């Protein structure tokens, strides 16, 4: 939804199993390829140069004016002395310091309501599969407790405080379908002994951030909500990397939305200007 990035270091075992390899993985929502802010595209380039991630997952790739965003980015990063590999895509994207062996669509884009792609690399003898996901932005149900409609973002007469109603609205999106497509596809990759990573803008909070310890803050209105997508992934054995490092959601909320930019009007930065809609919706 808005330009935001989350950078984490993943540790993977190499083929010899006695050594460990650190990979810096970046999830980056680029807010319509940076076009929403003056010189935003070059801000994207600058951030990548500064952070120097090994693997990047992008959300909101648009290929405006028929220009491939990934190809343009690879060219401009090379001018800055950084070699990255990437293949053309839309909605979601992947860049890597390692040559991409293959890339394919896992969940196709339809009516701009989310998509998933995956790419495979070989790193020090290990095959790694990276999924880049930008999940459905409609029925954004975490706005309901804040008193805003999650499709129109208009203020409602009163907040929704019934968990079953919130989760029913959440399931009306395609987010759970998109995550189940990842899980089903990734099981086949794991059966082949490949390491699987997922990065994306989920447009949905983690259930780990909506338990008893946070029910009375951030306009959670006393509710514990087991949000679908994060629960599906954790039940299939995946780890929420930020929560692995920072397990306390009260002290370390890890908000990725909304973000602040002094050059942009507040109304363009947040969907609910009269509510506390801070959430962690970008994940690795």
Which residues does each PLM region occupy?
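Active-site-proximal beta-strand elements of phosphoester/diester hydrolases
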Residues: 22-32, 127-136, 154-168
């Amino acid at each position: 939804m808005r330009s935001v990035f989350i950078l984490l270091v993943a540790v993977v075992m190499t083929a010899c199993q006695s050594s460990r390899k650190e990979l810096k993985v970046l999830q980056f929502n680029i807010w319509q390829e940076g076009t929403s802010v003056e010189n935003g595209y070059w801000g994207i380039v600058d951030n990548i140069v500064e952070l120097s991630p090994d693997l990047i997952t992008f959300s909101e790739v648009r290929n405006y004016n028929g220009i491939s965003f990934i190809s343009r980015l690879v060219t401009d990063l090379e001018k800055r002395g950084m070699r990255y590999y990437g293949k053309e895509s839309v909605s979601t994207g992947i860049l890597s310091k390692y040559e991409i062996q293959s890339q394919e669509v896992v969940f196709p884009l339809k009516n701009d309501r989310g998509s998933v792609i995956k790419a495979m690399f070989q790193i020090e003898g290990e095959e790694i599969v990276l999924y880049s996901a930008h999940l459905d932005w409609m029925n954004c149900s975490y706005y309901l407790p804040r008193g805003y409609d999650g499709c129109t973002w208009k203020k409602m007469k009163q907040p929704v405080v019934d968990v079953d109603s919130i989760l029913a609205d959440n399931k009306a999106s395609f987010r759970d379908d998109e995550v189940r497509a990842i899980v089903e596809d990734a099981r086949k990759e794991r059966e082949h002994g490949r390491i699987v990573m997922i990065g994306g803008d989920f447009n949905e909070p983690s259930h780990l951030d909506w338990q008893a310890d946070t029910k009375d803050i951030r306009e959670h209105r006393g509710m514990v909500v087991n949000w679908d997508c994060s629960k599906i992934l954790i039940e299939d054995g995946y780890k929420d990397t930020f929560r692995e490092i920072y397990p306390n959601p009260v002290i370390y909320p890890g908000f990725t939305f909304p973000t602040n930019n002094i050059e942009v009007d507040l109304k363009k930065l947040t969907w609910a200007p009269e509510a506390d809609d801070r959430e962690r919706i970008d994940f690795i």
